[in-house]
């Protein structure tokens, strides 16, 4: 009797903030799991995205962007989460941006040089490079930095060459039993995903006005008799002025955030959602390691 082989492994997606790691993860999975925003540092937790195709199961770890500044407790914890992801995976996808190369990229590269896992270099946003003649010399420069498994120019936004990345990943998955059922796409709870959706809308609708010192706590997540969910979200900010910014003129801003978050939740949970949002000032939460632990920022370290 022949037993079908199965393949399964962990892949870390790493890179400095805002190079498109979350967009790449979402594209590899075929749907939105990790929040994306033009603001740097929007991924605060390691999110596991699971993609199963026949005998192959790829488990993606979406790290916070590794970055130089470690002054605040939240930044130290985010760097720790990103570094710990690199250590225990079969493969690393190192995402960089077009022809840009920064000290933060250099720092990530140095961490990868010390690691044992093979590294795919994904050069993202190549469709945005204005001077196409600059691209080839830059790719040659990158190739000289480390013995990469492969260098793939991609656009996570449009999907260009993302299938190439997926094919390389499949080829390097070790023979192993699958960790998750084939219909799983993330190991995160619905409660966690609800908070991520609200946080994405805050980033999207407040943009540059909003500091990083905002987080979301789901105080209530219960099934109701209508076959849907009642969800209460608490938005924590550090100052009174930030609270006014989130609420907006006559509550217009928080209403928009709530409407858009509810739409995404209904799509993700495939059920009606009744969502209520509040804003509360809790000064200094991003500097307070104990508060961060209570909000789940170190639950996976």
Swiss-Prot record:
A cellular-component GO term for this protein: cytosol
Biological process annotations from GO: ribosomal small subunit assembly
Molecular function per GO: GTP binding; GTPase activity; ribosomal small subunit binding; small ribosomal subunit rRNA binding
Chain residue ranges for the region called G4: 124-127
Residue numbers spanned by region G3: 62-65
Keyword presence, Cell inner membrane: yes
Membrane topology: Peripheral membrane protein
Chain spans, region G1: 15-22
Domain of life: Bacteria
Coiled coil listed as a keyword: no
InterPro entries: G_ERA_dom (IPR030388), GTP-bd (IPR006073), GTPase_Era-like (IPR005662), KH_dom-like_a/b (IPR015946), KH_dom_type_2 (IPR004044), KH_sf_prok-type (IPR009019), P-loop_NTPase (IPR027417), Small_GTP-bd (IPR005225)
Ranges for region G2: 41-45
Keyword annotations: Cell inner membrane, Cell membrane, Cytoplasm, GTP-binding, Membrane, Nucleotide-binding, Ribosome biogenesis, RNA-binding, rRNA-binding
Subcellular location field: Cytoplasm; Cell inner membrane
Domain Era-type G: from-to ranges: 7-175
Binding positions for GTP per the UniProt entry: 15-22, 62-66, 124-127
Region G5, residue ranges: 154-156
Pfam families for this protein: KH_2, MMR_HSR1
Listed Gene3D superfamilies: 3.30.300.20, P-loop containing nucleotide triphosphate hydrolases
NCBIfam families (alphabetical): era, PRK00089.1, small_GTP
Family: Belongs to the TRAFAC class TrmE-Era-EngA-EngB-Septin-like GTPase superfamily. Era GTPase family.
Known role: An essential GTPase that binds both GDP and GTP, with rapid nucleotide exchange. Plays a role in 16S rRNA processing and 30S ribosomal subunit biogenesis and possibly also in cell cycle regulation and energy metabolism.
Subunit and partners: Monomer.
Protein name: GTPase Era
Organism per entry: Shigella dysenteriae serotype 1 (strain Sd197)
